[in-house]
């Protein structure tokens, strides 16, 4: 069985890794310009495929059947070829609901605020409504509720980010500060790269129930597999694939005083795991064209810390590395947050 993901830009997609981890079918990534979507839908040689931005609505007119949840949300992310034509489904609903449930987040009777008004916003709104939310408010850049009047929503209890703000490579950004929502008790962010966005880090610092979007991505893929080949992938298998992928994309960060052996341990871990190791002091030296002692001697510690901050900010965005930090790097709360 040949399956695929279609979208415009798929360079950073995890979908192939996830679907092939289920071990049920081959799976390819197919980047398509908009003017080739119709041709693919009508003549493509894939038995089934997922659809990502910006084509979740584009594919709908080509489907002879659209499932109730896809009609309700207004987008299709899963298509199968049948003798009766193309059948479209939406598995994001299942994925989002599963993510919230795993995080222990209950929408019943809650005041929910959704950041963003795109397709994923509609999914979040549908799930929250079906789960009994008391009030659901969508915040957009130009809507009645926007980022200039968030004080009107200070009673928010569940905050959901469906915007791309904070997504790789713009790590460290957040559409809002949780200080604007003093009653917030749960946060969901559909972004899965990075594993923990700035918004999720704010929630973790406050002890608020939260989840990033990676579990949603794996759960919706499992539901897609059900449509692809009638496979029943349970919670244990979803959890296994999620944990395996989360471990693969996280960096291993070594901290400690100078001379404690971080570089030696990094080299040993590199041999053991096959991961690439990176030393932040080496990155600083490469950028400056001189050694760390010479930087301290000629320009002082403040200049070195500026170079170190730039190095950490850049390397922390990457995935699956072993990062050996300088002795004073973790004295900065900003660095500690970035490296997580």
Predicted regions located by residue number:
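NAD(P)-binding Rossmann-fold cofactor-contacting core
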Residues: 131-147, 281-287
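Glycine-rich adenosine-cofactor-binding loop
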Residues: 7, 88-93, 100, 105, ...
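Adenosine-phosphate binding glycine-rich loop
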Residues: 190-250
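Conserved lysine of the Walker
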Residues: 262
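ATP-dependent small-molecule kinase phosphotransfer cores
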Residues: 282-331
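Phosphate/diphosphate ligand-binding glycine-rich loop within oxidoreductases
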Residues: 2-103, 194-196, 202, 206-209, ...
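Conserved small/polar residues in nucleotide/adenosyl-binding loops
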Residues: 334-340
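Rossmann-like adenosine-cofactor binding region
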Residues: 145-211, 326-333
């Amino acid at each position: 069985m040949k399956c695929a993901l279609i979208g415009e830009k798929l360079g950073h997609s995890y979908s192939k890794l996830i679907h092939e981890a289920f071990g049920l079918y081959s799976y390819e990534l197919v980047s398509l310009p908009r003017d080739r979507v119709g041709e693919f839908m009508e003549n493509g040689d894939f038995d089934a495929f997922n659809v990502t931005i910006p084509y979740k609505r584009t594919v709908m007119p080509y489907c002879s059947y659209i499932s109730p949840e896809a009609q309700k949300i207004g987008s299709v992310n899963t298509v199968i070829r049948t003798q009766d034509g193309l059948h479209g489904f939406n598995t994001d609903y299942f994925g989002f609901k599963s993510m919230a449930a795993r995080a222990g987040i209950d929408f019943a009777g809650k005041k929910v605020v959704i950041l963003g008004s795109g397709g994923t916003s509609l999914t979040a709104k549908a799930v929250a409504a079906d789960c009994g939310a008391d009030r659901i408010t969508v915040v957009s850049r130009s809507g009645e509720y926007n980022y200039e009047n968030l004080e009107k929503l200070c009673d928010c209890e569940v905050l959901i980010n469906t915007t791309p703000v904070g997504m790789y490579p713009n790590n460290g950004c957040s559409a809002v500060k949780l200080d604007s929502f003093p009653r917030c008790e749960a946060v969901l962010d559909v972004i899965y790269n990075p594993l923990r966005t700035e918004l999720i880090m704010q929630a973790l610092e406050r002890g608020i129930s939260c989840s990033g979007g990676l579990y949603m991505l794996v759960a919706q893929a499992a539901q897609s597999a059900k449509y692809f080949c009638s496979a029943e992938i349970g919670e244990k298998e979803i959890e296994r694939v999620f944990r395996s992928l989360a471990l693969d994309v996280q960096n291993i960060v070594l901290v400690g005083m100078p001379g404690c052996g971080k570089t030696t341990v990094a080299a040993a871990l590199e041999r053991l795991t096959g991961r690439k190791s990176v030393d932040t002091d080496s990155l600083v030296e490469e950028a400056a064209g001189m050694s760390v002692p010479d930087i301290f001697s000629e320009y002082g510690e403040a200049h070195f810390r500026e170079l170190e901050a730039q190095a950490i900010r850049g390397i922390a965005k990457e995935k699956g590395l072993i990062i050996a930090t300088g002795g004073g790097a973790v004295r900065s709360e900003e660095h500690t947050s970035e490296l997580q």
